[in-house]
Curated annotation (Swiss-Prot):
Transmembrane segments annotated in the record for this chain: none
Protein name per Swiss-Prot or TrEMBL: Uracil-DNA glycosylase
Keywords: Cytoplasm, DNA damage, DNA repair, Hydrolase
Reactions mediated catalytically: Hydrolyzes single-stranded DNA or mismatched double-stranded DNA and polynucleotides, releasing free uracil
Statement: the UniProt record of this protein carries the keyword Transmembrane helix: no
Gene3D superfamilies listed in its UniProt record: Uracil-DNA glycosylase-like domain
InterPro entries reported in the protein's UniProt record: UDG_fam1, Ura-DNA_Glyclase_AS, Uracil-DNA_glycosylase-like, Uracil-DNA_glycosylase-like_sf
Cysteines engaged in disulfide bonds, as pairs: none
Its EC number(s): 3.2.2.27
Annotated source species: Campylobacter fetus subsp. fetus (strain 82-40)
UniProt KW Cytoplasm keyword: yes
Encoding gene per record: ung
Family: Belongs to the uracil-DNA glycosylase (UDG) superfamily. UNG family.
Role summary: Excises uracil residues from the DNA which can arise as a result of misincorporation of dUMP residues by DNA polymerase or due to deamination of cytosine.
Amino acid sequence: MTIDLAKVKIEDSWKEVLKDEFLSSYFLEIKFNLINALKNGKVYPPSNLIFNAFNLTPFDKVKVVILGQDPYHNEGEAMGLSFSVPKGVRVPPSLANIYKEIKDDLGIIEPNCGDLSYWAKQGVLLLNATLSVGARMANSHSNFGWQIFSDAVIKNISEKKTGVVFMLWGNYARAKANLIEANKHLVLTAAHPSPLARGAFFGSRHFSKCNNYLIKNGQTPIDWDLNNYTLN
């Protein structure tokens, strides 16, 4: 059995870039693992949102990659974008710390909404290393094979694009730096924004560094102000 590419619900440019991944044996194993997980309980995000990051940020539009670990595992939180939650859901602690850093870095008022779709639509790929999770079980799908897929995403961006900003927060994300050609891109590393890191994330100023780099390379900077999105 193989994967039918026509049935993979992912944006066309990504489907072309990642075609070899979708047709590989490990991706078929991911599919079977997901089918079995769905038989035994709830899986987040909903299947139509698993590739949300790719559908909101086509390959040719990627300017920035923010790498997370796995989706939120509570009902109604995961939406297929790292660190993001839907409108109306309480802002999680790590995202609240990201907002505080943006305020300190750029003077932007902290929004009361956790939906990061506005960033994604500007070219910020909000990628989780693992794209699914079982209900109330953090990292429960970490052995499904998703990391092979997300590593391939990072490698393809690194090899086929130039001038991308990679934000790698925490030890897990920082370990992915070896997948990136640092002479072609900007790799920014810091502690994780989680409160468990005891504030070590603060002062990294990644958001201004990112925009300065994009401008230097002739690209439009990211508008990090989510208030411009939530007011629309």
